[in-house]
Amino acid sequence: MAERTFIAIKPDGVQRGLVGEILGRFERKGFKLVGLKQITPSRALAEQHYGVHKERPFFAGLVDFITSGPVVAMVWEGDGVIASARKLIGATKPLEAEPGTIRGDLAVNIGRNVIHGSDAPETAEFEIGLWFDAAELNDWTPSDQTWRVEA
């Protein structure tokens, strides 16, 4: 199986109508969408997801923000998808993100940076398992697969 990553469009991205734009960037890159849902996360889910930041001063505000509205949770699959997705997303601080990246083009403030992406294989596995049941992930072959990747 190819590598998988967890990507979430945060409430600011959903409210600003950026879902289609962001989905399109991943599709045009050639990655395969294997899981997709819109959910308003519970506090428990948000606290688990951002647990690594629990002792940081911004933790409570981050949890409040991510639970403030709908999030579009996704699982994308493809060779090198974790590293490539991080490049597509851009730097955490939007003002440091390169033009052409999602954050570089669509965000200004670190507290409203539109999107989350797993940063490592272990993180991706944890986040996918946290946000999705195995039955919610689809194993399928796109009709244009031979035009995207070499066998």
From Swiss-Prot:
Keywords: ATP-binding, Cytoplasm, Kinase, Magnesium, Metal-binding, Nucleotide metabolism, Nucleotide-binding, Phosphoprotein, Transferase. Its cofactor is Mg(2+). Coiled coil: none annotated. The keyword Transferase applies. The active site is at H116 (pros-phosphohistidine intermediate). Pathway: Purine metabolism. It catalyses: dZDP + ATP = dZTP + ADP; a 2'-deoxyribonucleoside 5'-diphosphate + ATP = a 2'-deoxyribonucleoside 5'-triphosphate + ADP; a ribonucleoside 5'-diphosphate + ATP = a ribonucleoside 5'-triphosphate + ADP. It is found in: Cytoplasm. ATP binds at K10, F58, R86, T92, R103, N113. CDD domains: NDPk_I. Its EC number is 2.7.4.6. One of its GO terms (biological process) is CTP biosynthetic process. GO terms for cellular component: cytoplasm. GO terms for molecular function: ATP binding; metal ion binding; nucleoside diphosphate kinase activity. Pfam families: NDK (PF00334). Belongs to the NDK family. Major role in the synthesis of nucleoside triphosphates other than ATP. The ATP gamma phosphate is transferred to the NDP beta phosphate via a ping-pong mechanism, using a phosphorylated active-site intermediate. (Microbial infection) Catalyzes the phosphorylation of dZDP to dZTP, when the bacterium is infected by a phage that produces the substrate for the synthesis of dZTP (2- amino-2'-deoxyadenosine 5'-triphosphate), which is then used by the phage as a DNA polymerase substrate. Homotetramer. This is Nucleoside diphosphate kinase. It comes from Parasynechococcus marenigrum (strain WH8102).
